[in-house]
Amino acid sequence: MEKEDIEKLFQEVKKSLQYSYCPYSNFAVGACVVSDDKNTYIYGANVENASYGNCICAERVAITKAVSMGYTKFMAIGVMSAKGRVTPCGICRQVIREFSKDINVYMFHDDGGYDMKTIEELLPDSFGPDDLK
């Protein structure tokens, strides 16, 4: 992605933090996926539940929202917390991998700086759709 695209992704991720529902942990997380054609940015925020096992991470909210809108191929995903940089949890890494073996994952800092890793770096030797063929 070009510098302008990464900046736009950061702004969308940052904006998504305001939609976090985190009354138990007070740990707001926002995420945004970018369609493979770079034309669509779809964001999500974490949603907590009193029954903690029912919580859903921001990355999965963004991806399921995108899939429900007809998007199934992504070139990038960005994530950050209101407290700064975070990385996707294991479940989110597997969900990200479901839709792209080559996606870049941008983990943003408060100031717009970021660390970028591929999903392969975050989830090496992964299991995915091709393994079921």
UniProtKB/Swiss-Prot annotation:
Class of the enzyme per the UniProt entry, highest EC level: hydrolase
Cofactor(s) of this protein: Zn(2+)
Active-site feature positions: 59
Annotated catalysed reactions: cytidine + H2O + H(+) = uridine + NH4(+); 2'-deoxycytidine + H2O + H(+) = 2'-deoxyuridine + NH4(+)
Record-listed Zn(2+) binding positions: 57, 89, 92
Record has Magnesium as a keyword: no
Residues at which substrate binds: 46-48
Gene Ontology cellular component list: cytosol; nucleus
InterPro entries, A to Z: APOBEC/CMP_deaminase_Zn-bd, CMP_dCMP_dom, Cyt/Deoxycyt_deaminase, Cyt_deam_tetra, Cytidine_deaminase-like
Domain called CMP/dCMP-type deaminase: residue spans: 4-130
Alphabetical GO biological process terms: cytidine deamination; pyrimidine nucleobase metabolic process
Pfam families the record matches: dCMP_cyt_deam_1
Key words of the record: Hydrolase, Metal-binding, Zinc
Membrane spanning residue stretches: none
Gene Ontology MF terms in the entry: cytidine deaminase activity; identical protein binding; zinc ion binding
EC number: 3.5.4.5
Summary of the function given for this chain in its UniProt record: This enzyme scavenges exogenous and endogenous cytidine and 2'-deoxycytidine for UMP synthesis.
Protein family membership: Belongs to the cytidine and deoxycytidylate deaminase family.
Protein name: Putative cytidine deaminase
